[in-house]
Amino acid sequence: MDICDISASQLATSPPPRTAIDFNSSIEESPVKRVKFSPELTKSFEETLSPTVTLVLRNNEEVIFDRYLLSFYSNYFRVLFSSKFRDSNSTTHRIRLISASDLHFLLTIPKAFEQGIKPNITLQKAIELLEPAAFLQMSIALDYISDIICKNLTHENIIKIFRLALLYHTTLAVRVWRSMVRKFQTLFATNVYLSLKENELIGLLTDKHLNLKSEDETTVVVNWIKHNSPLQSDRLTQFAQRNFSRRPQPDATKYEVIRTRQPMDAIVCFGGWASRGVAQKIEVCNTRSDRWQTCNFNYDIPNIHRAYHGIEVVEDKLIVYGGFDGIKQFQTTVLFDLSTKEWRRGANMNDKRCYVTSARVNDSYGRPLVFACGGMNGVSRLKTAEMYDYRADQWTEVANMTQMRSDGAVVTIDNKIVAIGGFDGRNIHQGGEVYDPVLDLWHPLSSNMRTRRTGCTAVSIMNQVCMIIGGFNGNRRLDSAEIYDMREGLWHPEPTLQTARSNFSACQMDTCYVYVAGGFDGQTTTKESERLDLRSKMWQALPDMAEAKSALRMVTLSDHPFLDELFDIPDDTGIVTSW
């Protein structure tokens, strides 16, 4: 029998409550939570005749444990030993649920964390320990076991693990439910979803975060009903008949869907230069409908509206630095926490920088660092570069580039920074250079682009490969694109844009698409956007942005609670409460 298999009589048949779509938990090792003994517990230990207790475990195994040790790591024992139960001071307690080896294993988890060691636990062992850890309320071990389980979720085991978690640990069930919502397109493609219970499928279909294409919703319901008996699918049939409606899609086709859904991923546009100065609107691209919409960003953050600035999202922190507001060049840094919705001023850069390019790499410990390369300080173009550690709130100068560059493109490839093109005040560059953060050294690329470019943008599209798009060659705005393969050191042409542009922004989404938006087309700032399908090698026109702007910056957010505020899609409680 599969370790996740449980009898039908044991199943908790309701999907998690609304918190399932709001819960956001980091899947990392849990820190040790220190506890302080209450006066009642201390007094109980002082009055008891024995500081040890004998536990009669599974198969009548008898093991002697220290009361303090058990109380320190288990809420169950802490309450048992400190309460006025008849057997609280008893020297013997029976717990048939757990074996001696498993209890010893659970106790070693927090001890290992105290020594800075990460315990090695397999998925099967974690599932076996879930029930006893939950019963004994061993929070440190339970959190770590939950982390192990969440890291090993696949489309094949996720449904069984969800049902198991509902029995023993609802916090884990919420996390697995959230993962099931994210992975549902894969569950559909592999037909694994057919093993869902009727109420589980209804619960998923009512979730606004469900990752399912609109054209597949009818197929999901029809195939599930065919796979199950009429008695098992009666409620789903009624649910579908009541809630399916026709909603228009961007490609002019129409699909029957249960409800409006929020995309798992989004592109957010900050700042830029519009017709009346710095752009004030913050726009978000709905990647389900491929439409731009103005979002309500009601947070009073000083100097968040900039043009020609740098911006990165690092561990829930939106970091904005440098740039230009039409009057002065910025040296300041602003950090906005996407989880707490709080902002703070960061340390100033070592120099003012507008027309700056930004990138992110990880240090040898895996910690993310933000880099600002080149730009202009109001007097001259810069060849300097510096890195920012937001934890220490410190900018540190690194090795200078070999050439002054403003309005160039910077991209991260294989944890190295590649700076391409740009302008030095006299010449537009055709070459590029690579920065190795380990050696703190820049060295030139092995070949030049096919044309000079400034005001261009670059994205990393796969391992060791980047794409540079658009720009200005000194005579005209460019609609061309090229890719550079670090392994062979050569440039190759790519399909041309539908609109020539410079000083725009681009980003990759879903490993399949490259989105570009805004910029200057040679006559005026533009609101046009388009995307490149990397599979078909074709550019596709998208609906316009709400505001024409250049010098904008775009970032991607994936499966983040902050998307709820940006899109503001109603929960549609009428669908949920009726079922």
Swiss-Prot record:
GO BP terms in the entry: proteasome-mediated ubiquitin-dependent protein catabolic process
Gene3D superfamilies: 1.25.40.420, Kelch-type beta propeller, Potassium Channel Kv1.1, Chain A
InterPro entries: BACK, BTB-kelch_protein, BTB/POZ_dom, Kelch-typ_b-propeller, Kelch_1, SKP1/BTB/POZ_sf
SMART domains: BACK, BTB, Kelch
Keyword hit for Cell inner membrane: no
Kelch repeat start-end pairs: 266-316, 317-363, 369-415, 417-463, 465-511, 513-559
Keywords: Kelch repeat, Repeat
Protein name: Kelch repeat and BTB domain-containing protein F47D12.7
Organism, scientific name: Caenorhabditis elegans
